[in-house]
């Protein structure tokens, strides 16, 4: 059962993103009011705003947490063409702010010449790295070589996507069989911009990212994209928020069947396709086991999707904007039964979803 709690966020404008930390006890929100707020969950389950500050000189599109082994670290990105990294500092014993925490800007990443539309930390096994994407069609990957000094970030890679970028997602798999991989979505509306999802893979030989696949069937603007946690699967699952919800599987083709030294090739299948929102879908987010997908759309609802024992994806719950459940929520979309879901456990730890627009 899902319990909904309403929070008076007190942002002065549209909230574009909601992000939970690794443990689900901290939350960050960002808004067109140029601010980020941090919320902490009390023992009673209530959320309290513990920090609020102006982060950028334009709308803040996204905010995201680093893995806690790197400390309490946030990254944000904005229409002001920058991304920023923030760290929470707790006052020392000789400080008048003893025991109190505050957030300090550690760096500003200024390489983009256009709006920075998404920012994501890499999976922790890759070290402290983050990726940004921007409206100029470039994905940039940065690394902090010294995790104790978050003011120093070096630009490691620039990936040209040829299309205005709206969202990115790292493949979270830590398997040595899988090279680092990042999916990029585009909301480019120009008539010659066809396929809106590209997947890039790191090549150990060239030490560069190369395009592995393009999802040719996704031709509508993409607002969000999310790889599912892997949990030992031999294939990858990718969710896409566009005018509907789509779930794809990417199964690696055996190396001996592909050109040596080139990027991995995949068999790509769409396994679920839902237009139940009857509107633009703005966010998709997986639970920690990669078994439940949450989506939010312009219909004002969050919908939960899960593969049943027959491996058909179905809607298992609908929450309205005020948090109340919708009766008769077992709506079905178009689902392909070829997806194997052999993980029975259902975790209730869903990441935040928010319907935010990125006018630029």
From Swiss-Prot:
There is a cross-link at residue 12 (Glycyl lysine isopeptide (Lys-Gly) (interchain with G-Cter in SUMO2)). Residues 324-360 are annotated as: Disordered. The keyword Protein transport applies. One of its GO terms (molecular function) is structural molecule activity. Residues 324-354 have a biased composition (Polar residues). It comes from the Eukaryota. This is Nucleoporin SEH1. It comes from Pongo abelii (Sumatran orangutan). The gene is SEH1L.
């Amino acid at each position: 059962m899902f319990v909904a709690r309403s929070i008076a966020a007190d942002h002065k404008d549209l909230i574009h993103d909601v992000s939970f930390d690794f443990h689900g006890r901290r939350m960050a929100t960002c808004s067109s009011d140029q601010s980020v707020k941090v919320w902490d969950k009390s023992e009673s389950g209530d959320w309290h705003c513990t920090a609020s500050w102006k982060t950028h000189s334009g709308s803040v599109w996204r905010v995201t947490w680093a893995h806690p082994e790197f400390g309490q670290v946030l990254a944000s990105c904005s229409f002001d063409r920058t991304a920023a990294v923030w760290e929470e500092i707790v006052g020392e014993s000789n400080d008048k702010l003893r025991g109190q925490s505050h957030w300090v800007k550690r760096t500003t990443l200024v390489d983009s010449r256009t709006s920075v539309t998404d920012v994501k930390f890499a999976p922790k096994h890759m070290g402290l790295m983050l990726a940004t994407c921007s409206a100029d069609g470039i994905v940039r990957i940065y690394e902090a070589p010294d995790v104790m000094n978050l003011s120093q970030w070096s630009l490691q890679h620039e990936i040209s996507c040829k299309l205005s970028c709206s969202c990115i997602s790292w493949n979270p798999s830590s398997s040595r069989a899988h090279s680092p991989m990042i999916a990029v979505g585009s909301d480019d509306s120009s008539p010659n911009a066809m396929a809106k999802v590209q997947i890039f893979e790191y090549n150990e030989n060239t030490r560069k990212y190369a395009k592995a696949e393009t999802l040719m069937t996704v031709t509508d603007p993409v607002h969000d994209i999310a790889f599912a946690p892997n949990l030992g699967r031999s294939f990858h699952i990718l969710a896409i928020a566009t005018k509907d919800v789509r779930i794809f599987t990417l199964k690696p083709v055996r190396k001996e069947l592909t050109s040596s030294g080139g990027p991995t090739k995949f068999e790509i299948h769409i396994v679920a396709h839902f237009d139940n929102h009857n509107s633009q879908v703005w966010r998709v987010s997986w639970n920690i086991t990669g078994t439940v997908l949450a989506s939010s759309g312009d219909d004002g609802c969050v919908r939960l999707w899960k593969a049943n024992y027959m491996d058909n994806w179905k809607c298992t719950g609908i929450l309205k904007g005020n948090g109340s459940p919708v009766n008769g929520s077992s709506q079905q979309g178009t689902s392909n039964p070829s997806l194997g879901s052999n993980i029975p456990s259902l975790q209730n730890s869903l990441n935040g979803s928010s319907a935010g627009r990125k006018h630029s």
